[in-house]
Structures are given as C-alpha cells and as structure tokens.
C-alpha cells in the first residue's frame, strides 16, 4: 500500500512538473547567473526599452519545466530591473542642487524650465524652495521631467518603490516579549 501511494505521488509530480513553464517556477527552484553590466551606462547589457532584462537561469536537477534546454538552462525576463532611458546624472543633479540650486539650475537641468526660472528670479524661493529641492532630489523623490530614472552607478544609492505581488514575502515583527 505504501509503495502504491509513493508511486502515484511520484507519477503525479512528474506529470505536473513537465507542463509548468520555466517562467512560472518558484524563485527557490532555480538560480540565475549574474548578468553583464555596461561600464558606460551602468545598466545591464540586455536592458530593453520596457526596463526588463534577460538573464540565464539554471533549474535544480529534479525540476522539469517547459522552456529549458538539455543542460537545464532557460532565459528568464526580469521586469523593472533596469532604467533604459536614463540620461540625467544623479550625482550632477545633487551637486547642482546644493551649489547652484538657489539659481534654479537644478530644475533647469532636470527639465523643469518654468520652475527653474521662478527659482532663479526669487533666489530659490527665498532659499525655501532651494532647501526643499535638496531634500527631494537627495531622496530621489524629484526626478527628470521626462519620467526616466537617474543615471547612476550600478551599485549606487538607488531608491525604489516597494511593490507587493503574489511572490512577495513579508513578515511583521513586533516587540512582544522583548522585555
């Protein structure tokens, strides 16, 4: 009886694994290799216009899925992994905001020409808008006017929005019993 149950479970597992697409596997069932980074743009070499990249991933030996080759390797598309149209330097923007922000040069550099002129003729909004812009730019809440991201070093200080989906694991930690 025990062998029959074991055989049935193995048959059902192997039959169901073969119909699963490799892109639909759980993150703990495959390992993706590091991708090449372009030294000029500080982005992935495979960065596409929709901000996704292609990475090569290898499944565990016992995983069967549709889309992998005989070596167990498949290409996976990772969404929102790069910034394709980034052309405004984050470092330059911060330095312009600190040293020339009261003249509105930072806003003009980002593409906000009208606000830059207002800051220029009001000396940074009597230095209030200047301080606000330093904070907004350093926290990356104020970006380029065309909607692209900042061009910054690959391991630079990137701030990104946290998005939750069906693959996100999060826990709540409390201090019950800490004392």
UniProtKB/Swiss-Prot annotation:
Glycans are attached at residues 75, 169. The keyword tRNA processing does not apply. Residues 106-109 are cytoplasmic. Residues 88-135 form the TM2 domain. Residues 1-18 form the signal peptide. GO terms for cellular component: membrane. It is found in: Membrane. It is a multi-pass membrane protein. Keywords: Glycoprotein, Membrane, Signal, Transmembrane, Transmembrane helix. Residues 19-82, 133-179 are extracellular. Its main location: membrane. Disulfide bonds: none annotated. InterPro entries: TM2 (IPR007829), TM2D1-3-like (IPR050932). The chain crosses the membrane at residues 83-105, 110-132. PANTHER family: BETA-AMYLOID BINDING PROTEIN-RELATED, TM2 DOMAIN-CONTAINING PROTEIN 1. Belongs to the TM2 family. This is TM2 domain-containing protein Y66D12A.21.
């Amino acid at each position: 009886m025990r062998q029959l149950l074991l055989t049935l479970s193995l048959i059902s597992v192997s039959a169901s694994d073969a119909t699963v697409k490799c892109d639909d596997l759980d993150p703990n069932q495959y390992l993706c290799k590091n991708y090449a980074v372009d030294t000029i743009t500080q982005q992935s070499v495979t960065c596409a216009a929709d901000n996704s990249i292609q990475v090569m991933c290898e499944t565990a030996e016992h995983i069967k899925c549709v889309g992998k080759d005989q070596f167990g390797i498949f290409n996976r598309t990772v969404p929102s992994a790069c910034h394709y149209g980034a052309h405004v330097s984050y470092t330059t923007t911060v330095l312009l905001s600190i040293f020339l922000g009261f003249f509105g040069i930072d806003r003009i550099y980002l593409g906000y020409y009208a606000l830059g002129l207002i800051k220029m003729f009001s000396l940074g909004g009597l230095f209030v808008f200047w301080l606000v812009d330093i904070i907004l730019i350093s926290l990356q809440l104020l970006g380029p006017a065309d909607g692209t991201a900042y061009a910054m070093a690959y391991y630079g200080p990137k701030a990104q929005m946290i998005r939750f989906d069906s693959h996100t694991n999060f826990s709540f930690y409390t201090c019950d019993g800490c004392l």
